[in-house]
Each structure stands twice: as C-alpha cells, then as structure tokens.
A protein has these predicted regions:
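Conserved AMP-binding
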Residues: 16-18, 98
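Single conserved hydrophobic/aromatic residue that forms the stacking wall/gate
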Residues: 1-10
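Buried hydrophobic positions in well-ordered alpha/beta secondary-structure cores of metabolic enzymes
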Residues: 11-14, 31, 35, 67, ...
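PLP-dependent aminotransferase-like
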Residues: 13, 24-78
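Small-residue (primarily alanine) positions within well-ordered alpha-helices
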Residues: 5-6, 31, 50, 109, ...
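A structured beta-alpha segment of the ubiquitous adenosine-cofactor-binding alpha/beta core
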Residues: 68-94, 98
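Generic hydrophobic/aromatic pocket-lining and core-packing "Φ" positions
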Residues: 28-29, 78, 82, 102, ...
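ALDH superfamily catalytic-core signature
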Residues: 61, 98-178
Length: 178
C-alpha cells in the first residue's frame, strides 16, 4: 500500500510520554502485522522505556529494520520525521501530543495526501443526568479528573451536571475528592 516507489518506511510514530508503550503499540503492531516497517520517535521525557521495549521486540525475533527507534526533541528528531513526508519517504504518520503540533503535522500530511492519525489534547465531557446512578457518576468523574493525574487525552475536561441533581452530586463528589 505504498504511494511512493521510493518509500521504505510505511509509518512514522511520534508519541507522548504519558503512555509510552500502549499508544505506539496500538498503531505499530497492526502496521507490522501487515508487513510494514515503522520509525518510532520516543517521547523526549521517557526515552528509556521505548528503548527497552524496542530491544525486547528485537530479542523476541523481530528482524532488524522493522522497528527503528529515534530519540530526541520534537523540534529536531520529530521534525525530521515530518520532513520525510514532504520528501515522499513515508506513507503514514501517527502523532499523539499537542494540538499545535498536530495541526502542523496534519497540514504537511494533507498537502502530500499522506494518511495521518492525530490524537490531540481532548476536552472530554461527562454529562450527569437525573436518571444516573450518582455513586457511579461520582466514581467516574473522580477517575476521569484525577486518574493518572489527568495526563491523558481521555481525561475529564468538562463536568456537566443537571441542575436537579447538582447539589447532591457535588456533595458526594467533593467528599470523595477530600
């Protein structure tokens, strides 16, 4: 499924530090299973885990050159991977990170008709209606707001509580927070 005869790499994966193994493997494993190679830019804040995981993959028998790990800052190593799109050397970019960088990657991919997967900072709402089980809603809101210190794209961004249950919900929620 190559759009460029010169393309040696199917996918470039640039991921954030908050889920340094799960997110890239969600994308790379299917690409590898389909016979493609990947360049993986490790998060600059957590490069050692990426290195250890790539090493384990090689030790398990994955041939050299299937996963190619790159370390460095986004403005250096990451930019190099994005520049490869303009050069016709890559067929897919997967990026997890900021909306600002995601917009730039989307623009580069769009003008080159290269597929991209962008997981950017979300503002996920939780809507609590009068028919809700308030104990479950409180538990969900608590985990969504504070689980993993809010460092994930699925963190609770907006809590919307129906006015008819607002006081009861907030009393239970604040008791859990304290």
């Amino acid at each position: 499924s190559s759009s460029s005869a010169a393309s040696d790499v199917y996918m470039r994966q640039i991921n954030a530090c908050n889920f340094p193994s799960a997110v890239p493997f969600w994308k790379m494993i299917p690409a590898i299973m389909c016979g493609n190679t990947c360049v993986w830019k490790s998060p600059q804040d957590a490069p050692l885990l990426s290195f250890a995981l790539a090493r384990i993959m090689h030790q398990a028998g994955l041939p050299n050159g299937v996963i190619n790990l790159v370390h460095g800052k986004g403005s250096g190593a990451g930019q190099y991977l994005i520049d490869a799109v303009d050069e016709g050397l890559v067929n897919k970019i997967s990026f997890t990170g900021s909306t600002e960088v995601g917009k730039m990657i989307g623009e580069v991919c769009g003008r080159n008709l290269v597929s991209c997967s962008l997981e950017l900072g979300g503002k996920n709402p939780l809507v609590v209606m009068p028919s809700a089980n308030l104990d479950n809603a409180v538990a969900g809101a608590y985990w969504g707001a504070f689980g993993t210190a809010g460092q994930r794209c699925t963190s609770l961004g907006n809590l919307i509580v129906h006015e008819g249950i607002y006081d009861e919900f907030m009393e239970k929620f604040m008791a859990k927070v304290k």
